[in-house]
Amino acid sequence: MAVEYHLTIKEMAAELRPRERLAAHGVQSLSDAELLAILLRSGTVTTTAIDLANQILSRFGGLRGLAEAGIEELQAVKGVGPAKSAEVRAAFELGRRAACRPGEWQPTVRTPEEAAGLVMEEMRYFDREHFWALVLNTKNRVLAVEKVSVGTLNSSSVHPRELFKNAIRRSAAALILVHNHPSGDPAPSPQDIELTQRLFEAGEIVGIKVLDHIIIGDNKFTSLKLEGLF
């Protein structure tokens, strides 16, 4: 009978264990698999938590796929039961909520990088186009993130009336438009450029400035303002 030996995490050298590495070097020093292993806490009889984490990431194609995996899909992986699957789903949901709760601290947005950073971790994983607006006051503080519409895989429909009705209700001074491209490529389409120009002109009429339109891709973005497209 063949015998295969596996080190448990407790049997690893202390400097190689994920929790110890996090404490010594900070959370950003850990790989995706190591972070996931901390959530999983244990593996199976034949695999460590890190091995199991690598299997999960491989099965779902990395973090992006894992973020969209449901409870039943996670439990289809050997070694992942109700507790582990719930912990993974809860961790991703907390990350998404933290990434898009501006009303709790009202950040100031002065650059395209700051605007994109506010919504990136939530919008980059959507499998349909979502159109949002960052609603700003006169000091560029975010009053709200308005979720204006949900479209299809490659398009979204936005009516100026709906966009500016909510902005006026919140006494907005300006807006930053944001939407995602599920393909991961943030390059603007001709329709994106046309819509931006139309909404910019509508904003001029009602007295609410459209400062930018940010297109979110897979951990990258395009600012139509920086590109000189409106």
Curated annotation (Swiss-Prot):
Molecular function, one GO term: metallopeptidase activity
Keyword annotations of the record: Hydrolase, Metal-binding, Metalloprotease, Protease, Zinc
Top-level taxon in the UniProt lineage: Bacteria
CDD domains: MPN_DUF2466
Binding site for Zn(2+): H179, H181, D192
Span of the annotated motif JAMM motif: 179-192
Segments forming domain MPN: 108-230
Membrane among keywords: no
UniProt cross-references to Gene3D superfamilies, sorted A to Z: 5' to 3' exonuclease, C-terminal subdomain, Cytidine Deaminase, domain 2
GO BP annotations listed: proteolysis
Record Pfam families: RadC (PF04002), UPF0758_N (PF20582)
UniProt family annotation: Belongs to the UPF0758 family.
Name of the protein this chain belongs to: UPF0758 protein Daud_1467
Organism of provenance: Desulforudis audaxviator (strain MP104C)
